[in-house]
Amino acid sequence: MSKVYLIGDLHGSFKPIRTFDEWNNHNQTFDDVMIVLGDFGGNVLFNYQDSNFKEKLGKYHMTYFIIRGNHEERPSILWAKNPDKWHAEEFFDGPVIVENDYPYIKYAADGMEFYEILGQNVLSIPGAYSVDKFYRIRMNYPWFEHEQLSQAEMAEGEFRILHDQPQVDIILSHTSPMIYRPTDLFLRDIDQSMVDTSMEEFLGHIELSLVPYKLWAWGHYHETRVYPKWSGGQPLMMYNDAVLDLNQFLASDNVYKGLKFFNKE
């Protein structure tokens, strides 16, 4: 059986993957999958840094399944701009977008989408709001207009949850439901009254429709943190200082048996 791992934001750094490779004694193959919970960092600057990062990931003999974050462009937009350089595939029994030069990197759909992973019904939810949006715009740093799900995408996703896929085992998102936002990690120089929390509010709303789930994992906040179970479900915030061995978690229903700390970038 292939192995599946989860990790948080990479932001264009291959070092956490290199450390994982060393920790894992180079035992993974391209049948094994590393799921990145947003802010992957491969489609940000559109120069040699992006391509160098994606090329280096290929050295570690894994397939990467990417949930889009807020600090990167939508793969669907890149595909529309460069139709000869991208294509669609099916992976985990669902639609993905692939850049031709990097076939080992699979991008989950830009809207809410269902997949089957290790026999589990999985919902992917990309995107988030950038709290440093106005600073990025002022400094001419990368900021992506379509970073969040649109209202139409959220409405469509909720409809599918209620009508097409009544049982969801695992939710993989970039940001979290409202109740799990780690306010102790918020940047002090950001006026929180100016922050758009519509996605977090939406995720909090749909969480009530998704219970009982087994696992909800997200990135975004740059810390790994295990939350108490709620209605049998395990909320988990992840950064790139740890991976979750999804096979072990599912076998034990114990997040601590699957969570492996190894590095901090």
Indicate residue ranges for each PLM-predicted region.
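Active-site neighborhood of phospho(di)ester-bond hydrolases with catalytic His/Asp-centered motifs
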Residues: 6-8, 34-39, 64-71, 107-109, ...
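Core catalytic region of metal-dependent phosphoesterases/phosphodiesterases
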Residues: 7, 13-117, 192, 198
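Cap/insert and terminal regions of metallo-dependent hydrolase folds
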Residues: 41, 52-53, 61, 65, ...
